[in-house]
Amino acid sequence: MRLTAKQVTWLKVSLHLAGLLPFLWLVWAINHGGLGADPVKDIQHFTGRTALKFLLATLLITPLARYAKQPLLIRTRRLLGLWCFAWATLHLTSYALLELGVNNLALLGKELITRPYLTLGIISWVILLALAFTSTQAMQRKLGKHWQQLHNFVYLVAILAPIHYLWSVKIISPQPLIYAGLAVLLLALRYKKLLSLFNRLRKQAHNKLSL
């Protein structure tokens, strides 16, 4: 049985709650000693993992809608993507304000360049910023065919973000490996599309070099 528009609306409400509740928990944990011995790192990792969860959920929607024959599920994809960006912004903000501190924000640019895992993180965030800014139907109409080309960069984020996570932890634990494995699986479900994109980019690069 296919989902109705009303059911999808309620699903969106549930997904908004799923995006908001972790923030409420984090606020509670900060104020009631619910974090570990290094609360700054805990906040950074929590916000980063939550952003990654929403990224994976966003990537899950298209294959799930296709294989489950639930086309209306696609309507939830933008919502999940925006929550991914929101949590990624919290993640970046927590690093800038809590790790570096307000008085050392001038060092942020240097940190992002000299630490490779931070470079991957900021590249991912900039891409998510562009995708969030252009996620409306008005922007889709304005950009035309270029809209899909831009939003294909989400697949690059799906590669860079798990690497950023793996690189950022001092001791490799199962958790970042699980996230990386899920990202690989979700990308593998799109191997035909990704192969087509790769061949197109290679052809364009070859044509430019031939000029």
Curated annotation (Swiss-Prot):
Cofactor needs:
FMN; heme b
Q: Which domain of life is it from?
A: Bacteria
The record's keywords, sorted A to Z, are: Cell inner membrane, Cell membrane, Electron transport, Flavoprotein, FMN, Heme, Iron, Membrane, Metal-binding, Transmembrane, Transmembrane helix, Transport
Presence of keyword Electron transport: yes
The gene that this protein is the product of is: msrQ
Q: What is this protein called?
A: Protein-methionine-sulfoxide reductase heme-binding subunit MsrQ
Q: Which GO terms describe its cellular component?
A: plasma membrane
* Compartment(s): Cell inner membrane
- What's this protein's family per the entry? Belongs to the MsrQ family.
Q: Which residues form a coiled coil?
A: none
Q: Which organism is it from?
A: Shigella boydii serotype 4 (strain Sb227)
Q: Does the keyword Cell inner membrane apply?
A: yes
Q: Which membrane topology describes this protein?
A: Multi-pass membrane protein
- Taxonomic lineage from the root: Bacteria, Pseudomonadati, Pseudomonadota, Gammaproteobacteria, Enterobacterales
Give the Pfam families listed for this entry: Ferric_reduct (PF01794)
GO terms in the biological process aspect are: protein repair
An example molecular function term from Gene Ontology annotations: oxidoreductase activity, acting on diphenols and related substances as donors
Q: Give the stretches traversing the membrane.
A: 17-37, 82-102, 116-136, 153-173, 178-198
How many cofactor units bind, and how? Binds 1 FMN per subunit.
**Principal subcellular localisation of the protein:** membrane
